[in-house]
């Protein structure tokens, strides 16, 4: 939400890398405890939003975005871990693996799967950075048939 409202480079980078990879993994291995419609709508919306921001050229990723987003994710997970410990919950499966089969099933027992998940996350961030290479400045683009590119051009000119 912050990325959409502010177009802050940091928020867009975090939404793209952490949101896309986290929601993507969740969609591939859904948790049986959540209502299916809400689960798929929420996680799908994260991916669609991140895709629209980055691939629609509404916002660009900066050099070093992978590392900034990864460091932000580690800090966020540390805060979530403290919250989990204090309130005896298991948000983001930091305290124990989900009951259903997921990628975490193959990464070893707790707490070792957390390290494996961190490595997999960094690899996913790197893979997500591949299709988002250097961008052409908006004022150098020719008029486009794609509305998102025209919107980006209008926003850049203001």
Locations of regions flagged by a protein language model:
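Membrane-interface helix caps and helix-loop-helix hairpins in membrane proteins
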Residues: 6-10, 29-38
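Membrane-interface loop-to-helix entry segments
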Residues: 36-48, 115, 119
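Cytoplasmic-side transmembrane-helix entry/capping segments in multi-pass membrane proteins
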Residues: 12-20, 39-41
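Membrane-interface transmembrane-helix boundary segments in multi-pass integral membrane proteins
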Residues: 66-75, 87-125
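Membrane-interface capping segments at transmembrane-helix boundaries
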Residues: 59-61, 127-145
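Alpha-helical transmembrane segments in multipass membrane proteins, preferentially the mid-helix core
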Residues: 45-63
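Aromatic-anchored segments of alpha-helical transmembrane domains
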Residues: 19-29, 73-83
